Swiss-Prot record:
This is Putative ABC transporter ATP-binding protein MG304 homolog. CDD domains: ABC_cobalt_CbiO_domain1 (cd03225). PROSITE patterns: ABC_TRANSPORTER_1, ABC_TRANSPORTER_2. Belongs to the ABC transporter superfamily.
Length: 270
């Protein structure tokens, strides 16, 4: 579905490239998490895929066609701050604008709007001033605008990093569930290690290069990689890994809290 081929990019007046000969491919209906330090090239990649920056020709292909020829209508972007994407007064205005911009038949708009409001659980709030919505509701409002135009690829650039832990976890699981049900593809740029377990594939970027691509099942076998690149791993992760190693069991799944470690130990000591 998406092929990135020898993608390099250098910002104007910068001597060092932000991306260096990046190569990877994504299959349809795939959830990919991209992780790396600040300066690893994550946000640059999102900007190139989303059309905010102009990529060199013949380096990004969407369904076999150069992205510069296909355009960006099939790509939906969810950013860190929803206020950067919500420019109207109400969600209804935002939805109408998105639908008009994508050439949706005006006769179908009311049905589409009702459907997406139901999906994101914002029924009755389409005419509420956006300034009155909570941060989480605003993120769902942006997601509603994306759902309405049915993109094939969703780009999430640190979309949940400004939410508190529990709300972020609830919202991301909800959004990922909806995208999976639609059988669409998602690229999630993240600093949250537990997001990696929600993905099908993980891309580890370092200094503009693809350092490693692996599956969530191999995460605990790659802890040395995180250490080598000076990531501060969550304490529950480290504890879980040590306990699993001591018990000669393979650790799988997300470890968000110490209670997860306790539950896992109790399960394997029965």
């Amino acid at each position: 579905m998406l092929n990135v081929t020898n993608l390099s990019f250098t910002y104007p007046r910068h001597s060092q490239p932000a991306l260096k000969k990046l190569n990877f491919s994504l299959k349809p209906n795939t959830h990919v998490a991209i992780i790396g330090h600040n300066g690893s090239g994550k946000s640059t990649l999102v900007k190139l895929l989303g059309g905010f920056l102009k990529a060199p020709k013949q380096t990004i292909f969407f369904r076999g066609q150069p992205l510069e020829e296909v355009g960006f209508r099939q790509i939906g972007i969810l950013l860190q701050d929803p206020d950067m994407q919500l420019l109207g007064d109400t969600l209804h205005q935002e939805l109408i604008f998105s639908l008009e911009n994508h050439g949706v038949d005006p006769k179908q708009m009311d049905r589409v709007i009702a459907d997406v409001l139901a999906v994101v659980e914002l029924q009755g709030k389409q005419f509420t001033p956006l300034s009155k919505l909570s941060f989480g509701e605003k993120q769902r409002a942006v997601f509603a605008c994306l759902l309405a135009v049915k993109p094939e690829l969703y780009l999430l650039d640190e979309a949940f990093s400004m939410l508190d832990g529990k709300l972020a976890s609830k919202l991301k699981r909800f959004i990922f569930k909806v995208i999976k049900e639609q059988q669409k593809t998602v690229i999630n740029v993240t600093h949250d290690f537990n997001d990696l377990f929600l993905a099908d594939e993980i891309i580890f970027l370092s200094k503009g290069q693809l350092l490693k691509q692996f599956s969530p099942a191999a995460i605990y076998k790659q802890l040395h990689l995180f250490h080598q690149h000076h990531f501060t791993l969550p304490f529950p992760w480290l504890l879980a890994h040590e306990v699993a190693d001591h018990l000669h069991h393979e650790m799988k799944g997300p470890i968000e809290e110490l209670q997860d470690v306790v539950d896992w130990i109790c399960k394997h000591l029965k």
